[in-house]
């Protein structure tokens, strides 16, 4: 396969975001400072040194805005404030200052496809009549059939069930329906409405003016809807369970790109231009590349890589397809293994089927080999951090945390659980609070006598930051060494990428300055012979230049 390197000046660009390693913080589960069992901003500030020592370039903070918390904070009632459970605006300002002092950039989650149903704009729409200016800011429609008892169309929700809910008029009679592609408490806004555009423009400027370095645009591919809201033609069920959901008239619609261009102009107007990352779940890398054209977003989440599983042909196909699609638009790739929406990859890699469905719809209920998953996760870390472009680390990934799959049902909070009729447990298992220190829960996440909002497994005493920091063979030590080498050796930050000839189930490539990565996904050991001198391995068992199965190594060519 050909070398992947552009001739449009990309190699000379030094924008920090092109090769950044960004650490996702889910604030409820990061660190609790005030003994209420829920993580907060002061907790994040108290643990920033861990992230600096880890060697990340930026943090991305999941929603911390005022919210009824019907979807973990992704139902936002006030975009320009902080939910009291996390702190206040002054805490956020201090966090920005602390992070910047450590050389860490800050990105915030930005949810613009929908608001909370408690947002003042939606509350005003509820009290306004049909056809009013207030209702035009969302999608209110009359129903179909006798008495309007059927939804306006057949669209289905990402969390299961139909994407429409019906209002009750003040006199008790049935009213109009409103659209929500996610939970009923998350009504979709109408991006053709000027009031909506101006409101979100103000939100963008509010956070940029406070010193935020960038925004991660949640559910960007959902923001456009085809005119007339035509039927999608799907069978009943969950949006993400459908094989052709990406072709829906409410997903990846072309005119949503004008919204992204609007924000890019705002961000580019600052002395140090701001950065946008988009979450776009679309059909293939070619469609994905449209979101990172020069006048749109800077980078985008790579779900194809996340879903590739532990398959050499599939991983190779995704890497090649991603680099081919992004090169013409001059955008860097990003690589991600886990997030707050996915079953943790260590657990996925310990299963017979190692891929994942998006949005946490993982109901496989099969036994997991965590030893195998850990071995593969270590190799996947070296693979991911060796690829050209940027990378994401989801909190706890650097500790080798598995999915918590035995949370008591009465504690599950993800709306997927209820909306799916208790068929899909949702995403709570990847959101369990982090273990920092100690021999028993809450492992330093909170005070010893506090019960976290989700319980931690008792055996996580082996996976605390303190325990792993002193163990040279731990997952944390591996991540720290890999990130240190990634910063130290400039070749990892260059766009050069050349495939090396290896057996089908062995992935090998060369980056700049003769840096090489070899990953053995086969059932047999692989001899890497004279490919180079070992810099770092996912396993210490690299005798006689032999790479065991499910292991990876970084090499320096002679």
PLM regions with names:
Residues 1-532, 537-558:
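Active-site and adjacent substrate-binding regions of carbohydrate-active enzymes
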């Amino acid at each position: 396969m050909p070398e992947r390197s552009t001739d449009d000046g990309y190699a000379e660009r030094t924008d920090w975001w092109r090769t950044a390693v960004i650490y996702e913080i889910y604030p409820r589960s990061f660190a609790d400072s005030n003994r209420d069992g829920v993580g907060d901003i002061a907790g994040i500030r108290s643990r920033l040194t861990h992230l600096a020592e880890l060697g990340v370039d930026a943090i991305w903070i999941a929603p911390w805005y005022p919210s009824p918390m019907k979807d973990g904070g992704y139902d936002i009632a006030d975009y320009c404030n902080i939910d009291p459970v996390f702190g206040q605006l002054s805490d956020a300002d201090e966090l920005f200052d602390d992070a910047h002092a450590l050389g860490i950039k800050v990105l915030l989650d930005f949810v613009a496809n929908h608001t909370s149903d408690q947002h003042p704009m939606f509350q005003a729409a509820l009290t306004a009549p049909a056809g009013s200016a207030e209702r035009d800011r969302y999608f209110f429609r009359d129903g179909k059939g006798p008495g309007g008892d059927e939804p306006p169309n057949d669209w289905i929700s990402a969390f299961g069930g139909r994407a429409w809910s019906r209002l009750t008029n003040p006199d008790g009679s049935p009213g109009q329906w409103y659209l929500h592609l996610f939970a009923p408490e998350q009504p979709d806004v109408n991006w053709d409405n000027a009031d909506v555009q101006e409101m979100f423009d103000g939100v963008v400027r509010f956070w940029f003016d406070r010193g935020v370095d960038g925004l991660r645009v949640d559910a960007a591919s959902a923001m456009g809807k085809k005119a007339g809201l035509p039927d999608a033609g799907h069978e009943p069920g969950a949006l993400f369970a459908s094989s052709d959901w990406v072709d829906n008239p409410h997903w990846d619609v072309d005119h949503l790109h004008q919204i992204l261009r609007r924000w890019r102009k705002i961000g580019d107007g600052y002395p140090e231009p701001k950065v946008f990352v988009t979450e776009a779940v679309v059909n293939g890398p070619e469609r994905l590349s449209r979101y990172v054209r020069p006048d749109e977003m800077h980078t985008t989440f790579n779900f194809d890589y996340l879903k590739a599983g532990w398959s050499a042909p599939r991983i190779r196909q995704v890497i090649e397809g991603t680099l081919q699609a992004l090169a013409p638009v001059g955008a860097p790739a990003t690589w991600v293994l886990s997030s707050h929406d996915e079953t943790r990859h260590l657990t996925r890699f310990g299963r017979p089927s190692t891929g994942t469905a998006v949005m946490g719809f993982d109901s496989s209920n099969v036994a997991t080999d965590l030893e195998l998953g850990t071995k593969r996760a270590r190799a996947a870390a070296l693979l991911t951090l060796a690829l050209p472009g940027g990378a994401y680390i989801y909190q706890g990934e650097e500790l080798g945390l598995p999915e918590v799959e035995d949370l008591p049902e009465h504690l599950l909070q993800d709306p997927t659980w209820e909306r799916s009729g208790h068929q899909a447990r949702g995403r709570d298992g990847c959101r369990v609070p982090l273990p920092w220190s100690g021999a028993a829960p809450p492992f330093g996440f909170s005070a010893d006598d506090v019960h976290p909002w989700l319980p931690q497994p008792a055996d996580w005493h082996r996976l605390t930051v303190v325990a792993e920091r002193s163990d040279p063979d731990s997952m944390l030590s591996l991540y720290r060494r890999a990130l240190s080498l990634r910063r130290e050796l400039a070749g990892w930050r260059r766009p050069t990428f050349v495939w090396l000839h290896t057996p089908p189930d062995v992935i090998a490539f060369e980056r700049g300055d003769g840096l090489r990565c070899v990953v053995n996904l086969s059932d047999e050991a692989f001899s890497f012979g004279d490919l180079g001198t070992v810099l770092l391995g996912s396993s210490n068992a690299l005798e006689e230049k032999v790479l065991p199965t499910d292991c990876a190594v970084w090499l320096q060519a002679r």
